[in-house]
């Protein structure tokens, strides 16, 4: 080795491993308005200090690796590195912390949820120094939000397209979710729409199977929509699931839906992927289609409290990527969802501005500027007795979706739809008259059932049905 080479090797570089906290833990740092901020729930391995664990998360999700490398000297780490700038102990837990990390905006490709998640929730989640890691929340800066189109249309444009105001929208998932022929499927769609629903829906796993190919389903559902519209004088829709094995096939299905003149298509955004979802959202805006989003696979990611990613993060990502509706739990039905937490991310979906609110699990103030809002969809194990609570919890800007709660009616699909529409109209009228839905809900439904035999029959069938299980994902509270 030449003397010149030896001299260069000894200046500004020292091989070896050093603590992450020496570079990536910066409690004096004041986050910039342009930084993406993340709140991680960190459970270190025994003996790993919280500062080292938080710094490791910042490092491994930005510029760091396990050892010092030559090429660190070829760039400005201070400009590009993530910084763990604050750590809070989690109330009631012995070795768990909320670590706040700031990422410079230059780390991320414009308009790409895929790239953002590849960094922030990538390899770091398998890091051995951590027993568990969960991304609780993100603050998306305005500068980054403006690089996204967002939802194809948003809440107000959808209401104008449908000419429906002053109440939640009503939907129904066609059951059984798999096995029906396209013609029988279309018949069920027609009966539900004729009975008073605004929408019917493909289930998340209805794509293009041997028993019902997608093109046949689209044709029979379009026929059902037009027939129901002619009979009721209302605009109707069916969420035609365009999810496919390739992006090209997905867009082909959306093109066919547009050619049929239907108002809305659907996508499974987690199994389909954010790249596919963003592409479909762009197509929908350009071609006047509404986009319904199903969150199939979300519980694999978000249900465990200590590891994974909270749904509020997935909800924010969807608002960036694009969708006009997204499933958001029910609070009262068969699927996971604590009330305060659910209402927290429902507001993040709908509102332009949401303040930090620990009581609802919101770690950062979020401003969406001109990004349209997304309608939350309440779906899963709900029926007419839940209608007052759903109307009170979710308000007008929501979709209330009754699958079994429509198709399970003893008189058939259309009477099931009638029962739900009557129950909803009764709840909206009672609320507008100043009645307390939370306290008087059951009375309101009973009163309405006197004038609707369809509702009375539904009330009798589902009077004993409850799903009384505690939520797994709950707010942090001190152990008393």
UniProtKB/Swiss-Prot annotation:
It catalyses: 2 (2R)-3-phosphoglycerate + 2 H(+) = D-ribulose 1,5-bisphosphate + CO2 + H2O; D-ribulose 1,5-bisphosphate + O2 = 2-phosphoglycolate + (2R)-3-phosphoglycerate + 2 H(+). It is found in: Plastid, Chloroplast. The modification N6-carboxylysine is found at residue 201. Pfam families: RuBisCO_large, RuBisCO_large_N. Keywords: Acetylation, Calvin cycle, Carbon dioxide fixation, Chloroplast, Disulfide bond, Lyase, Magnesium, Metal-binding, Methylation, Monooxygenase, Oxidoreductase, Photorespiration, Photosynthesis, Plastid. The modification N6,N6,N6-trimethyllysine is found at residue 14. GO terms for cellular component: chloroplast. GO terms for biological process: photorespiration; reductive pentose-phosphate cycle. The disulfide bond which can form in the large chain dimeric partners within the hexadecamer appears to be associated with oxidative stress and protein turnover. Mg(2+) binds at residues 201, 203-204. The active site is at residues 175, 294. The record marks 334 as: Transition state stabilizer. The modification N-acetylproline is found at residue 3. PROSITE patterns: RUBISCO_LARGE. Heterohexadecamer of 8 large chains and 8 small chains; disulfide-linked. The disulfide link is formed within the large subunit homodimers. The basic functional RuBisCO is composed of a large chain homodimer in a 'head-to-tail' conformation. In form I RuBisCO this homodimer is arranged in a barrel-like tetramer with the small subunits forming a tetrameric 'cap' on each end of the 'barrel'. RuBisCO catalyzes two reactions: the carboxylation of D-ribulose 1,5-bisphosphate, the primary event in carbon dioxide fixation, as well as the oxidative fragmentation of the pentose substrate in the photorespiration process. Both reactions occur simultaneously and in competition at the same active site. Belongs to the RuBisCO large chain family. Type I subfamily. This is Ribulose bisphosphate carboxylase large chain. It comes from Alluaudia procera.
